[in-house]
Amino acid sequence: MIIYNTLTGIKEPFVPFSIDNVRVYVCGPTVYDFAHIGNARSVVIYDVLFRLLKLLYPKVTYVRNITDIDDKIINVAQNTNQSIYDVTAIYIKAFHEDMRMLNCLEPTYEPRATDNIDVIISLIQKLVDSGHAYVYNGSVFFNIESYSSYGQLSGRNISQLIYGSRIDIEVGKKHPGDFVLWKPATEIDNQLMSCWSSPWGLGRPGWHIECSAMSYRYLKENFDIHGGGADLQFPHHENEIAQSCCAFPDSRYAKYWVHNGFLTVNDEKMSKSLGNVLTVRQLLNSGITGELIRYVLLSTHYRKPLDWNSQMVASAQESLNRMYTALSSTNVDLSLDDSVELSSHVIDCLKDDINTPKAISMLHEMVTEINKTADMIEKISLTKTLIKTANFLGILQHSWQDWFKIDDNNQEISQLIDERKKARANNDFKRADDIRQLLLNRGIVLSDNKDGTTHWYKK
């Protein structure tokens, strides 16, 4: 397996610290609202990576955190007269429901920041004691000038970090690039109980230290892969490296850094001001299936930008319909036995830097072979491999009947299809076309197979 490492800027052979337990950490959601489609892209991409690693190695420990203490969470709690725990409980539950609809596996561990305050405080104290952090009026800041390799992930150097350059400016900082590890409690924090006792007084952790603490608790000083969106590369991931490597000088923290690309909607960045934030829940409620969402997210290479638009969704729908139509030609049972093997060609695509679009194109080549062959034994064998391999990618989870919402008791549609078949046999193509259009006007799409049969599905 080879993977692109943001830290080195090249694709590298994947060599884990231990083949007996591959360890992965991915930045998860901040739970103040429903997950949007950009959040979902990250979850789906690292779900495929998790599946692949589980195939290749005997044990994989996958940690995806939940940020359940944050300024945005506090704002929602304050505006809705709820506790932060009530707010986060709502959106954690929703996140889990939505990701299940996208057929994502659960991570091995899903720690919450508020359950790890003791680890966070211990790590901050370690940085203070070693001179890499300093205290000012109840705040604790990390001193970036104490870490000579700061900027290695993002390609920045300390001299570039001037006031106003994507960094928070706060009173008490020694350098404008220094970042907060611990914030003193405000009056609102006290009211909402969003603060904890510490050696520096009541307060709450900064965002960056949370991930360092949780990755350390579950994966220790060194682990194999750290994933997240490209927007997290700086400052979040850069700061994680700095504080973790300073807390544990003999460690390198994560060996491989993997970042998925940005997602836009109709060529525009998602933002509440534009009113174009698409949540997974909105899409599901609009009738777009979780499998279709997943297919769209996998149809572009994870490192490339992805633009969500109606044309892409329609194209993905047609592609999935084509796959399910191929299943209908053999009617193979979805519950396959272990003797059915995955397509080695598809797995090879995934082993080449998680190349999901190429893997999907290989699935469509299999569909073409299924449609071409007249040998039913070969057709069934190919169909079984298609189902097993597509399932590995998290798609083709339904029977073709369920996918096309077929109702076997709808005699009228069956009679019209039979009438159309007779019309075609008698070269009455106008009548055949009229019947097709009549059904189309009612939302029924016909799909003619090479063996002379016709299936239908609802738009």
UniProtKB/Swiss-Prot annotation:
Quickly give the catalysed reaction: tRNA(Cys) + L-cysteine + ATP = L-cysteinyl-tRNA(Cys) + AMP + diphosphate
MF terms in GO: ATP binding; cysteine-tRNA ligase activity; zinc ion binding
Q: Give EC number(s), comma-separated.
A: 6.1.1.16
GO cellular component terms given for this protein: cytosol
- List positions binding Zn(2+): 27, 211, 236, 240
InterPro entries, alphabetized: Cys-tRNA-ligase, Cys-tRNA-synt_Ia_DALR, Cys-tRNA/MSH_ligase, CysS_C, Rossmann-like_a/b/a_fold, tRNA-synt_1_cat_dom, tRNAsynth_Ia_anticodon-bd
Motif 'KMSKS' region covers 269-273
Give the binding site residues for ATP.
272
Concerning its family, UniProt says: Belongs to the class-I aminoacyl-tRNA synthetase family.
Q: What is this protein called?
A: Cysteine--tRNA ligase
Q: What gene is this protein translated from?
A: cysS
